Amino acid sequence: MRQQHEITTSGPLLGSDGNLLEPGWARSLLPVYRRADIKAGAMRVKEWDYYLITDGHIGLALTIADNGYMGLDSVSFLDFDGKWEKTTSRMRTLPLGRTQLPESSAEGASEISKGGYALTFYHEDGARMLSFHMDKFLGKEPIEGIVKLTDEPDESMVIATPFDKPGHFYYNQKINCMRAEGWIELGSRRYELTKDKFFAVLDWGRGVWTYHNTWYWGSASGELDGVPFGWNIGYGFGDTSAATENVLFYDGKIHKLGEVKFEIPMDEDGFEDFMKPWVFTSDDNRFYMNFTPVLDRSAFMSAGVVLSDQHQVFGHFTGRITLDDGTVLPVRDFFGFAEKVENKW
């Protein structure tokens, strides 16, 4: 297991050449992101806010993304008991940063409003507020709702990852284990979200990416014996020699993990079978999970030079984790997801 570099002081994320000044991981947004410091062209800059809210029975995902040449705004509703999901996305041509997503997740508003839909993520009285509506979401049925996120943990997963190509980087924050309350209306159906059952994660990303990437990401949020608990695991892109993004969240604090491997089963023809049980292991032996899939939110898109092949698989994890102090905790039927995504973008 290799040593990982923790960033412990605040300062600019990028130097005058547009490269990361200090690759590594942190427990908060200590590196300061400024879009004006980026040296790459606006076509290559990618910025997004992604929220997932679930109680293990239903789920809601909201995205506002400005990927330079393309904007992507989407709403997903997932029914894990009924084993179905619906994602509706709206694309925008050449936003080139005009979406004006905030330079910090801790302040400002992310918002987009176009014909037939609107999404707004903002702060109010110490809470994160998510407001959304989209016409013709499921056939002719609209979807709308308001969700309030509270109980943000003291620490989050923050990582600054360089690519081999100069001026390219990814700056990312994952905030797990937020409690969610509010409502969703899908057509004539209304769903009430109560904070004793629903948890949320924020995936906040800013960076300049290379063209072709494949990543693996897994996340879970909930309670373990009454204590807020979850994890963020992932790999696959950039130079992660300084740090991984693998962490446990336990009672508001981060417990750092080494490298985690996703073992996705194969079918008899040698292709990945995402709905068979997976296995997760770590090089420090602090994360071991068997994963039983329930639903694969799969999507494939190919248009010219752009390609996206996604498998976001939701299900239940059973295994064990080890905290920084050596405490071993068993985990049983803990709801979360793991994904494999290939992008040419």
Which stretches of residues belong to each language-model region?
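Structured soluble/peripheral alpha/beta segments that form catalytic or ligand/cofactor-binding pockets
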Residues: 1-345
